[in-house]
Amino acid sequence: RNAVHERFTEAMNANDLAGLRQIILDCEIACPISGTRNWTEVRQFNLMFSTQMGSTAEGASTIYLRPETAQGIFVNFLNVQKTGRMKLPFGIAQIGKAFRNEIVARQFIFRMREFEQMEMQFFVRPGTEMEWWNRWKETRMAWHRALGFGDDNYRFHDHEKLAHYANAATDIEYNFPFGFKEVEGIHSRTDFDLGNHQKFSGKKIQYFDPETGESYVPYVVETSIGVDRMFLQVMSAAYTEEQLEGGDSRVVLRLPAALAPVKVAILPLVKKDGMPEVAQKIVDELKYDYNVVYDEKDSVGKRYRRQDAIGTPFCVTVDGQTLEDGTVTVRHRDSMQQERVKIETLHALVDQECSYRKLFRKLNL
């Protein structure tokens, strides 16, 4: 077995396709499903999308769509560092499209040819990368757990086989209804990217460290989230079908309040007696700070159900008592409990529950 492994490694490193095929034939490797040994020739697959750029076919140039968003950060490292007067360690983050020419696009959104990435490249002094890699591992796990979908639903999966650019790598996996799948990767990329950009461009991409008096190519710790996977994680965790007393049921999207697209629904109990006008004034008070909807159609019960289904944390009902004492009924999405509050306290209530401050305080940063 060791001899075969050595042959395989040598053939892979030498890009010896004929040698790889000979190993398959010598070992009489069979397909585990069909049992056939009728293999095709060993071929190279290009996992980057190529296209043509140019106004005419004759003058067109071949270009490639980016397989990751990270390289734009590396190319602009010095620009950002100098204009921002940044000192190491610091990070540059972005979100954008990436493209992979997947051999077989499947596994729902886990193998797509076009997808959205959120990435951060964190630049550190060489020799400190493992300390920062471990710190970012814990920070990123804390961020995911702060969403409130259950600490036990997350785990680390450390890589046994590392990519050519990494000296450490781990994935954060979430327990989807169909099992654990990766949602984020944390990698120590060493100086591979900046070093190669410097090598092939012929331009210095180095940082002068005022503490040590040295110039060097920084090492990089990367965090990378698949936005599509993250969206699926949030939706699968939040979606709930509940059976209520009396035989009724409801669909509720238990989104973290900070992530809910609509924070508050303002509902006049009836479309008369001045209630719509008061409700609209409340909308005007809140709409500059939060995404607020106004809904006056159907019974208030049906309106509650509509807001539950899209994850709105609060429904505010304007009724006859509102006209008398300036109070409204606030209904909480998850518990369906209601409380009476003054109109002037609504902003503070929504801010306390829906602000990202509440989410980030859980990280203890």
Segment roles from a protein language model:
Residues 1-365:
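NTP/phosphate- and nucleic-acid-binding module
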